[in-house]
Curated annotation (Swiss-Prot):
Residue numbers of Pyrrolidone carboxylic acid PTMs: Q33
Localization: Vacuole
Name of the protein this chain belongs to: Glucan endo-1,3-beta-glucosidase, basic vacuolar isoform GGIB50
One CC-aspect GO term: vacuole
Top-level class of the enzyme under EC nomenclature: hydrolase
Originating species: Nicotiana tabacum (Common tobacco)
Domain of life: Eukaryota
Annotated GO MF terms: glucan endo-1,3-beta-D-glucosidase activity
Active site, per annotation: E128, E273
Propeptide boundaries: 349-370
EC number: 3.2.1.39
Keywords, comma-separated and alphabetical: Glycoprotein, Glycosidase, Hydrolase, Plant defense, Pyrrolidone carboxylic acid, Signal, Vacuole
Length: 370
């Protein structure tokens, strides 16, 4: 005992505390790996691609969604170890569906030429294509385009590395309440069933854009702000044995239920977009956005009542983009165009929103005192 007591010096205590801080940091980083951020480029004042990727790395953001195969961004991603959801834009869907030669060319130029230096995890063929929106003219081409890209990925020898899917929004859901009764719209079933069948057969997830903000702002009389921000103190929806305290889970689980009803019980979900604007419309405030993002990052580690476990989630978006419309769309960024954080979010720390200088300064002080 005397020997043990003899070595219990302030220096040893500092070393022990530093070790605990480093261990805690590594655990938090691992826990935050379910989170990525969407890299949109619709602004005339955004940083260059190299600066953006360095910002991802410095903030411990390990996943990125890219909406089109921008070669400048892909070059900057080389060697970064950031996992990428690579978009095939709506404007290319019809062309890719028209023949395998086009799919092979697209995969060669935008995937294989950058592999394995860029860790492409998904190809998102199209974004929010739907028979009930202005993209209905593309619906008959979507699944054929997905099939062609899937075949081209396989021919390139990357079939075990890259999954092919598409990103949809909640307009395809006909019934979402209660979540266990979730189902796709009858007038979209022909479209959805083809997608679900493809994903089931290729063991790929469905990519879903989930925005509690729009549900709340469109119906504030029926949907409360706390329920939308993950801050409801009590259960809001009792669905059999499942209890819902936040709208995000209810929306997510309604899609899972809809998938099961469409023969896709084995199909997983990746949340390909979620966010909250800080200005520009009803309910879009700095405080609401900070609260939602902080809680989303924490909640993504936990899962939903129907599907416990980490939820791979991509926050929309990295920057405020001043060329987007309407006004609301300009204010979804985690960062301002000058790379200054709007909310001091760091993805390597549990809880999401914090001042990164706190731990850095504390660790530096410990080291200086040893």
């Amino acid at each position: 005992m005397s020997t043990s007591h003899k070595h219990n010096t302030p220096q040893m205590a500092a070393i022990t505390l530093l070790g605990l801080l480093l261990v805690a940091s590594s655990i938090d980083i691992a826990g935050a790996q379910s989170i990525g951020v969407c890299y949109g480029m619709l602004g005339n004042n955004l940083p260059n691609h190299w600066e953006v990727i360095q910002l991802y790395k410095s903030r411990n953001i390990g996943r990125l969604r890219l909406y089109d195969p921008n070669h400048g961004a892909l070059q900057a991603l080389k060697g970064s170890n950031i996992e990428v959801m690579l978009g095939l834009p709506n404007s290319d869907v019809k062309h890719i569906a028209s023949g395998m030669e086009h799919a092979r060319w697209w995969v060669q130029k935008n995937v294989k030429d950058f592999w394995p230096d860029v860790k492409i995890k998904y190809i998102a063929v199209g974004n929010e294509i739907s028979p009930v929106t202005g993209t209905s003219y593309l619906t008959s081409f979507l699944t054929p385009a997905m099939v062609n890209i899937y075949k081209a990925i396989g021919e390139a020898g990357l079939g075990n590395n890259i999954k092919v899917s598409t990103s949809v929004d909640m307009t395809l859901i006909g019934n979402s309440y209660p979540p266990s009764q979730g189902s796709f719209r009858n007038d979209a079933r022909w479209f959805v069933d083809a997608i679900v069948g493809f994903l089931r057969d290729t063991r790929a997830p469905l990519l879903v854009n989930i925005y509690p903000y729009f549900s709340y702002s469109g119906n504030p009389g029926q949907i409360s702000l706390p329920y939308s921000l993950f801050t409801a103190p009590n259960v809001v929806v009792q669905d059999g044995s499942r209890q819902y305290r936040n709208l995000f889970d209810a929306m997510l689980d309604s899609v899972y239920a809809a998938l099961e009803r469409s023969g896709g019980a084995s199909v997983g979900i990746v949340v390909s977009e979620s966010g909250w604007p800080s200005a520009g419309a009803f309910g879009a405030t700095y405080d609401n956005a900070a609260t939602y993002l902080r809680n989303l990052i924490q909640h993504a580690k936990e899962g939903s009542p129907r599907k416990p476990g980490p939820i791979e989630t991509y926050i929309f978006a990295m920057f405020d983009e001043n060329n987007k419309n309407p006004e609301l769309e300009k204010h979804f960024g985690l960062f301002s165009p000058n790379k200054q954080p709007k909310y001091n979010i760091n993805f390597g720390v549990s809880g999401g929103v914090w001042d990164s200088s706190v731990e850095t300064n504390a660790t530096a002080s410990l080291v200086s005192e040893m």
